[in-house]
Amino acid sequence: MSKQILILPGDGIGPEIMAEAVKVLELANEKYSLGFELSHDVIGGAAIDKHGVPLADETLDRARAADAVLLGAVGGPKWDTIERDIRPERGLLKIRAQLGLFGNLRPAILYPQLADASSLKPEIAAGLDILIVRELTGGIYFGAPRGTRTLENGERQSYDTLPYSESEIRRIARVGFDMARVRGKKLCSVDKANVLASSQLWREVVEQVAKDYPDVELSHMYVDNAAMQLVRAPKQFDVIVTDNMFGDILSDEASMLTGSIGMLPSASLDANNKGMYEPCHGSAPDIAGKGIANPLATILSVSMMLRYSFNLHEAADAIEKAVSVVLDQGLRTGDIFSTGCTKVGTQEMGDAVVAALRNL
């Protein structure tokens, strides 16, 4: 029986980078006889333009029925002035919540070919390989109550809520420990337990879960210190587990240690490893339509999809190898370009990966 993959290109550069990722996926599908069937739909601003909402019910139903979802990016200035509850980003939050995608895996890997593109000195960044495990469906992005009220003195006051239950913390902690167990057996839990009640519970529950993983070394770090340590000595980290907002911020910070956020894929998984896969970067409306966006993060998201949702490690390894081959050839989009390399556009980069994959 075939596996169903739902393609959601989204907004901005989303359609451009997705086109290249789909070419790679289609070749892998043929080369390794994967039995995938691909279908396409809209999300974010594109869905607002078509349906009036950032995620139509029928699209959500198709996502539920699919075996995996491949997403481009959402958002753009065109929709910045509309009501917050129907902005493009709400479609992304909704699909994550409705599919139960609570575990977000964000790798930060510095390819040796891109050592000069890192914001850090080579001796600090060389060999960097961090995995950030971010809780994705709880915390301050979903907490209630939230809103804006007018005080007695006439001044407006806005407020948000950062709730976490024991079960929410426990399940994401287990993802972190499981990932650490198959990597370097080191897990750093990042919180703000010196200030936040939610972080105090977070730390307590993570300590409880740690008893089931005696082979994994657990450490704790406050988020402000973690942000500093990522720049000072990033290779001290192997796997980081943290909450929604902290993970959002730290993973973007970690991305620049690798040279470009355009290189970084991500996976969002449910309890059964059904997932949605997307690049870490946004929709980059400033370069949309110019054919210069880096498609490698989206292509590497395909590799993560094959690995984590389907256990197709041979095909996943081949895609990652093809990307490495292209980098060895000196091909670079503008965001990772350096002297002595050849600057290429979105389609050229995608074609090069396809050619490399075909020749493996």
Curated annotation (Swiss-Prot):
Enzyme class: oxidoreductase
Record-linked InterPro entries: IsoCit/isopropylmalate_DH_CS (IPR019818), IsoPropMal-DH-like_dom (IPR024084), Isopropylmalate_DH (IPR004429)
Cysteine disulfide partners in this protein: none
GO biological process: L-leucine biosynthetic process
Subcellular location: Cytoplasm
Organism domain of life: Bacteria
Co-factor remark: Binds 1 Mg(2+) or Mn(2+) ion per subunit.
Family, per entry: Belongs to the isocitrate and isopropylmalate dehydrogenases family. LeuB type 1 subfamily.
SUBUNIT field: Homodimer.
HAMAP family: LeuB_type1 (MF_01033)
Protein name: 3-isopropylmalate dehydrogenase
Protein species of origin: Pseudomonas fluorescens (strain Pf0-1)
